[in-house]
Amino acid sequence: MLVWLAEYLVRYETAFNAISYITVRAILALLTALFISLWIGPKVIKRLQILKFGQEVRNDGPESHFAKKGTPTMGGVMILFSIGVSTLLWANLANSYIWVCLFVLFGYGAIGFVDDFRKITRKNTDGLIARWKYFWMSVVALVAILWLYWLGHDTDATRLVIPFFKDIMPQLGLFYIVLSYFVIVGTGNAVNLTDGLDGLAIMPTALVAGAFALIAWATGNVNFAEYLHIPYIKYSSEVVVFCTAIVGASLGFLWFNTYPAQVFMGDVGSLALGGALGVVAILVRQEFLLVIMGGVFVVEALSVILQVGSYKLRKQRIFRMAPIHHHFELKGWPEPRVIIRFWIISLMLVLMGLVTLKLR
């Protein structure tokens, strides 16, 4: 929005021309989202306490989690608000990719909000009925995918980038829709499953979003795209602003969510952030890179799938409890140790993912 204002004001003061640079707006978006999150955080937490929007805890979970019961949840609303305001202020709103990203963010956020609200009003951990939850997640995902498919300016927009192989980029055609569906829905659920400990999901989210900011910038720059042998997606560099807004909002939320947490993001935050990462990965054609950099999310989701599958087939559990972070808790790891080690792993995976861009 401020891009348009700067275009007018530059006639009178050339310093406003700085706002036309994507790097400047990306930094400002990060700082804006961070400051908004820090500013409204105490107010949101107090309001959630007044409304008695407290966390419900599973009876079969680790005993250390019983003390978390009643901690304000649905704090993801402050994340969404911070990202939304920051993006609307600093992004070029004439860019359709920005609206696709915001659509998924708030679409999944709305689904998560309803899910959280049902848990709170029913005083248990059962939210939306699974089939309805997946139905609405699928609707949002498919609308966004078809929107992106329609926006595709050239064949590169539907190519599949395979790490380590610069000359292998198959054209997906309509399979692009199928792959993209699983990426968005899968990432939304994976981040949701990861959000079980204080700060566990939000830091990897910030790291992955920061990495995708760099990738989106390179993808939208014809020279860097050619240098890295990745598809050049026209206008995709504007998504950098959205990604850095996620980073800023995530860091601001972490201020209140770090152990011991003052607030939880709830499904309204985790589903929204997961969906946002998924749609950005599709937009910049780096689905495989999302699997690498978001490895913590992938492992958390796989642990649940393996646990459920093993119990149904063999009546035996692989882990003491799934998602896998609970397994380590039941083995005696203190919660902060699990969190910090997962953060370290996430940082290493993000760096590995970025390195693969050059090792091709």
Curated annotation (Swiss-Prot):
It holds the Pfam family Glycos_transf_4. The keyword Oxidoreductase does not apply. One of its GO terms (molecular function) is phospho-N-acetylmuramoyl-pentapeptide-transferase activity. Its cofactor is Mg(2+). One of its GO terms (cellular component) is plasma membrane. Keywords: Cell cycle, Cell division, Cell inner membrane, Cell membrane, Cell shape, Cell wall biogenesis/degradation, Magnesium, Membrane, Metal-binding, Peptidoglycan synthesis, Transferase, Transmembrane, Transmembrane helix. It comes from the Bacteria. Pathway: Cell wall biogenesis; peptidoglycan biosynthesis. It catalyses: UDP-N-acetyl-alpha-D-muramoyl-L-alanyl-gamma-D-glutamyl-meso-2,6-diaminopimeloyl-D-alanyl-D-alanine + di-trans,octa-cis-undecaprenyl phosphate = di-trans,octa-cis-undecaprenyl diphospho-N-acetyl-alpha-D-muramoyl-L-alanyl-D-glutamyl-meso-2,6-diaminopimeloyl-D-alanyl-D-alanine + UMP. It is found in: Cell inner membrane. Its EC number is 2.7.8.13. The keyword Ligase does not apply. One of its GO terms (biological process) is cell wall organization. It is an enzyme of class 2 (transferase). Belongs to the glycosyltransferase 4 family. MraY subfamily. Catalyzes the initial step of the lipid cycle reactions in the biosynthesis of the cell wall peptidoglycan: transfers peptidoglycan precursor phospho-MurNAc-pentapeptide from UDP-MurNAc-pentapeptide onto the lipid carrier undecaprenyl phosphate, yielding undecaprenyl-pyrophosphoryl-MurNAc-pentapeptide, known as lipid I. This is Phospho-N-acetylmuramoyl-pentapeptide-transferase. It comes from Haemophilus influenzae (strain 86-028NP).
